């Protein structure tokens, strides 16, 4: 809403209506003519498109942002017209907040487009080991509270050793679904972790990516973040541990990648003194130069709505105080995940050429090779022939898509923004590696061994010189790379920016201009953007038909 949520809050959302974005102000709708109704429907579709299928309407608010308000009779009239507009636009709506204006009530209405596929956001959970990330995922997705001894985490563990050690070491995804009224779908199912049923019955799906918190698994955590192209992130910190371990590093990943994030302080059922100290530490870290966020403590449903409204700006950092044992604060977090709109405009990428970085691979009995990954661009269909590669000899091969699953549901096709699993014919399990790509046959495949990048050294204990080696991460691809040369200078130190030529040490990869890279080695870390690639010669790149 265009008012301050509570006394003393740092959040300010006053201001006139913007032409872009998914927020629309309406002072009064009245009894529109047929032509006016058509314009309102077109306008709603535009706002929904701007918000990836979700929008907010402020009823009783002038274009300048003044909270005028509506009388009771006007509220009934406006909502009746609004219902007609929403139905014509193929959307559903609900009032999320109602506050007092100068002359009556101001209503905030959440609108969600009815789509063939559910509206989706991807949200990884980051934070130090033992902060309660997996338990939080387990509680949110099953609706059953934790016993205080990590039982909830075992419900979503991927491997036996994760249950035994009580420590996540891999990347796993779990669906939290919402129906049209904002209620969680998982709670309504016999098996709340049945992804296919959650997906099919939901209007909105939050894909929660559970990641490892231990420093030892940081490479896996980076792969999980980069490979899923998140809309937002939840950075989890335990109240009894504070901002220790990998908390700051994981927070830094969100900052350097430009991912808006919220902080979840767990275990608030323990010592209140620790909760207070941890909250103070988190607020201090969020205000540091380089992070520069406005902390916004969410302790009402109204705050949760506001947090969802403004998280995509990247300016605020909502803070949730939650307990996996008592359930305190979890309803606010669910509301936030339900209302937070998709940040990435996947519709604009659907018509581009297909691009999928392989995130994982499986050998399924009776099926053969199955690979998984997020569609970064384009669309793909069953029986379509695509390129897979590059292989160590810089070649690509033509393979056939035998079947596709999205969220464990068998589908005929998948599109940009969806995480799919696809069975491939024409290539062996041992030949395909994580970090390879699946490309449309319209794409000219290229295998890159060297590239030029603008980099920013976030930290290095001494100086970086030509010959320096680190591990480079690009989406799900990672391998050692060497700095061949530093253009225009001899060395780089902490805080320096420069242009370098880098060479992949083991094998070629599919890289292109504009991609973000992260490089790490020991305590050294940096980020960069590829500005030029040097593909292998055309003769070395070929696509062969699968054997008959």
Please annotate each region the language model reported:
Residues 81, 135-140, 172, 220, ...:
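Alpha-helical scaffold elements adjacent to nucleotide-binding pockets in ATP/GTP-utilizing enzyme cores
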Residues 49-51, 129, 167-169, 197-202, ...:
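Conserved catalytic network of the ASCE P-loop NTPase/AAA+ motor domain
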Residues 204-207, 211-218, 228-249, 255-277:
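Conserved Switch II/interswitch segment of TRAFAC-class P-loop GTPases
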Residues 112-211:
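Conserved G1/Walker A P-loop phosphate-binding module
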Residues 59, 130, 136, 166, ...:
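Residue-level signature of catalytic and energy-coupling elements of molecular machines
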Residues 122-125, 270-273, 427-548:
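C-terminal effector modules of nucleic-acid-centric enzymes and ribosome-associated factors
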Residues 1-117:
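Polybasic/polar functional segments that serve as interface/processing modules
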Residues 121-134, 138-142, 289-461:
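Conserved catalytic-core segments of large NTP-driven translation/proteostasis enzymes
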């Amino acid at each position: 809403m265009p008012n301050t949520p509570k006394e003393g809050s740092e959040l300010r959302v006053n201001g006139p209506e913007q032409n872009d974005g998914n927020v629309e102000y309406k002072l009064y709708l009245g009894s529109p003519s047929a032509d006016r109704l058509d314009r309102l429907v077109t306008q709603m579709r535009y706002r929904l498109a701007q918000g990836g299928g979700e929008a907010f309407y402020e009823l009783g608010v002038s274009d300048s942002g003044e909270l005028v308000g509506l009388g009771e009779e006007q509220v009934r009239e406006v909502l009746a017209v609004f219902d007609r507009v929403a139905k014509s636009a193929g959307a559903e709506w609900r009032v999320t907040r109602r506050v007092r204006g100068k002359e009556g009530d101001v209503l905030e209405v959440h609108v969600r487009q009815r789509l063939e596929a559910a509206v989706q956001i991807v949200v990884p959970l980051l934070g130090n080991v033992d902060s309660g990330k997996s338990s939080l995922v387990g509680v949110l997705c099953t609706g059953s509270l934790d016993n205080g001894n990590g039982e909830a985490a075992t419900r979503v563990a991927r491997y036996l050793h994760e249950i035994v050690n009580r420590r996540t070491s891999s990347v796993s995804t779990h669906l939290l679904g919402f129906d049209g009224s904002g209620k969680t779908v998982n709670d309504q199912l016999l098996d709340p972790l049945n992804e296919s049923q959650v997906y099919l019955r939901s209007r909105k799906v939050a894909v929660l990516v559970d990641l490892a918190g231990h420093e030892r698994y940081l490479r896996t955590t980076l792969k999980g973040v980069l490979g899923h192209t998140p809309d937002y992130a939840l950075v989890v910190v335990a109240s009894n541990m504070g901002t220790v371990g990998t908390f700051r590093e994981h927070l830094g990943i969100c900052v350097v990648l430009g991912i808006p994030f919220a902080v979840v302080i767990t275990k608030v059922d323990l010592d209140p003194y620790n909760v207070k100290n941890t909250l103070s530490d988190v607020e201090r870290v969020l205000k540091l130069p380089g992070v520069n966020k406005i902390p916004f403590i969410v302790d009402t449903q109204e705050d949760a709505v506001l947090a969802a409204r403004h998280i995509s700006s990247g300016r605020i950092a909502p803070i949730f105080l939650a307990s996996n044992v008592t359930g305190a604060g979890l309803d606010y977090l669910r509301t936030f995940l339900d209302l937070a709109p998709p940040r990435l405009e996947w519709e604009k990428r659907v018509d581009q050429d297909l691009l999928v970085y392989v995130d994982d691979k499986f050998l399924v009995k009776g099926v053969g090779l199955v690979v998984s990954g997020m569609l970064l661009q384009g669309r793909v269909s069953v029986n379509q022939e695509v390129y897979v590669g590059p292989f160590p000899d810089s070649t690509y091969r033509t393979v056939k898509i035998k079947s596709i699953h999205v969220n464990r549901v068998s589908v005929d096709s998948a599109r940009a923004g969806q995480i799919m699993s696809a069975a491939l014919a024409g290539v062996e399990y041992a030949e395909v590696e994580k970090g390879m790509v699946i490309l449309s046959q319209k794409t000219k495949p290229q295998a890159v061994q060297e590239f030029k990048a603008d980099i920013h050294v976030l930290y290095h204990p001494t100086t970086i010189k030509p010959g320096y080696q680190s591990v480079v991460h690009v989406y799900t691809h990672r391998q050692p790379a060497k700095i061949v040369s530093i253009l225009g200078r001899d060395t780089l130190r902490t805080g320096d920016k420069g242009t370098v030529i880098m060479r992949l040490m083991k094998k070629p990869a599919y890289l292109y201009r504009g991609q973000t890279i992260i490089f790490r080695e020991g305590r050294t870390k940096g980020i960069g953007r590829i500005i030029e690639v040097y593909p292998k010669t055309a003769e070395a790149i070929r696509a062969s038909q699968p054997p008959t």
